[in-house]
Amino acid sequence: MSKLILAINAGSSSLKFQLIRMPEEELVTKGLIERIGLKDSIFTIEVNGEKVKTVQDIKDHVEAVDIMLDAFKAHNIINDINDIVGTGHRVVHGGEKFPESVAITDEVEKEIEELSELAPLHNPANLMGIRAFRKLLPNIPHVAIFDTAFHQTMPEKAYLYSLPYHYYKDYGIRKYGFHGTSHKFVSQRAAEMLDKPIEDLRIISCHIGNGASIAAIDGGKSIDTSMGFTPLAGVTMGTRSGNIDPALIPFIMEKTGKTAEQVLEILNKESGLLGLSGTSSDLRDLSEEAESGKARSQMALDVFASKIHKYIGSYAARMHGVDVIVFTAGIGENSVEIRAKVLEGLEFMGVYWDPKKNENLLRGKEGFINYPHSPVKVVVIPTDEESMIARDVMTFGGLK
């Protein structure tokens, strides 16, 4: 029998939602509430394929959830509030405490709060959503799905930094990795598309959007990933630097008189594609500029692709080979150019890809871009974190 599950992503002043029919994984409706706690909050919901937008003051997340549930009934999306049997909440950081999704109790809520020091911008906001739903829908399971959980299978040699060991023991300083829900979804989907058990596959998953991370997935388990203690580490991103020499931070402070916080702000919000190009963090803008002859925009694209290319080689070495390379997220799904740059020269690894197939796969299309004879398969898979969240609600909420 079908069940309706809500997949939730709560920000400090926003609430993104999808109502999904399970186990069919059919989207019933989706929407966004913005400017919560501010004047003129915006509520957008999809009804019969059309976006319906209203502007009203919404004082907090509890009121936002209340308005959303009322809208479901008003638009005949549900008959009754009891039609919704579970909610799944994206939580950015689960630390070492949560190696998998978990049904939310008061104790779990408290532990998510304690982990806020590892994700001060996100965990408190995620908790606002959790508390609102637990208050208004007290009789159904609520499940926390952590961005970090999928990577908790990494071995020590992958997650430890070469710092004095007590920093790890005392402060939890280690690589955690992010985008776990996306990497988990696309790796499972790749196995389905190949009609092979995931246990038999070595997958390199490239989640490339404004934020980007690469994961080495061996037998369905993450054994390494490019992001680190925070989502700042790894490859070049839209506005984030990715990996740099740590000694640059005091050097920049000394040269510019900036504080550590100001330098961190630069690394997070003024670097990456934006910093390199000097014009934009949006890959589409940079591609146009590069075509019109802007050398810095071309250089930014080259650096961006080069870092991803390097991780693919590194992770192939970590897994003693690779069977599948997956591209997903906004850029991975839609940029023919970046995929081509990333794959260039990988023939030595057994990667043979078809430029025509590559050009045809964008705007939500799924498929292989390798030649049939290629030992390594290359696949574009639109990510669907909400479906993964809904699956985990079914599993960990005891609804199967």
Swiss-Prot record:
Residues holding substrate: 90
Main location group: cytoplasm
Sequence positions that bind Mg(2+): 9, 385
GO biological process, one term: acetate metabolic process
Residues forming the catalytic site: 147 (proton donor/acceptor)
Cellular localisation: Cytoplasm
UniProt keyword list: ATP-binding, Cytoplasm, Kinase, Magnesium, Metal-binding, Nucleotide-binding, Transferase
Required co-factors: Mg(2+); Mn(2+)
Keyword Nucleotide-binding tagged: yes
InterPro entries listed in its UniProt record: Ac/propionate_kinase (IPR004372), Aliphatic_acid_kin_short-chain (IPR000890), Aliphatic_acid_kinase_CS (IPR023865), ATPase_NBD (IPR043129)
Comment on bound cofactor: Mg(2+). Can also accept Mn(2+).
Domain of life of the native organism: Bacteria
Site-annotated residues for Transition state stabilizer: 179, 240
GO CC terms, sorted: cytoplasm
Enzyme Commission code(s) on record: 2.7.2.1
Binding site for ATP: 16, 207-211, 282-284, 330-334
Family recorded in the similarity comment: Belongs to the acetokinase family.
UniProt subunit comment: Homodimer.
Functional description taken from the UniProt entry: Catalyzes the formation of acetyl phosphate from acetate and ATP. Can also catalyze the reverse reaction.
Protein name: Acetate kinase
